[in-house]
């Protein structure tokens, strides 16, 4: 679930509210209508029986809406337990891990990214049983928050969508409950359910020591594998 707010108090938004209220509109129709409007100013007016007029310059559309009271409420998440992350860094974590998530729904637990928070570190792990990717970063959180440990599995598709939505925001806040996670970036609220179950212990798949260590130029390695993949 995604919730986006447009603050009326910000002068650049140039929003005028004549009457407070709410309406639920068909997402596809509303999105296509807004894309086709030529003028920058849009007026939305809700009439009887939830009929909604959308006008801009000489264009006018009327679509049927639904009572906002029938729309499901967003889950209430305790905002006192907040983990703050640099947006650019967290997007890197997503990029480096979701590539290893499974696309097979037969093992739904592997379609997510296992995120654990312990001792001021966030560890993100993903595997489809053939590939494994892990990223560890330091996190900023209140002292009381650092004493708590978290172990959650977030759907990979949700993280991909989140990465697309948050762009220019400097930081992103993460709040975790028993079965939900909320990401907040300025005026965007992104809710996702958590996958239920136990993630495989991937620590056993990463050797603690090795007898051989190879250091390679990253660019040269990528070029070589790219050429070799032509015949795979």
Spans of features found by a protein language model:
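DNA polymerase sliding clamps and clamp-related checkpoint/processivity subunits
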Residues: 1-100, 121-169, 173-232
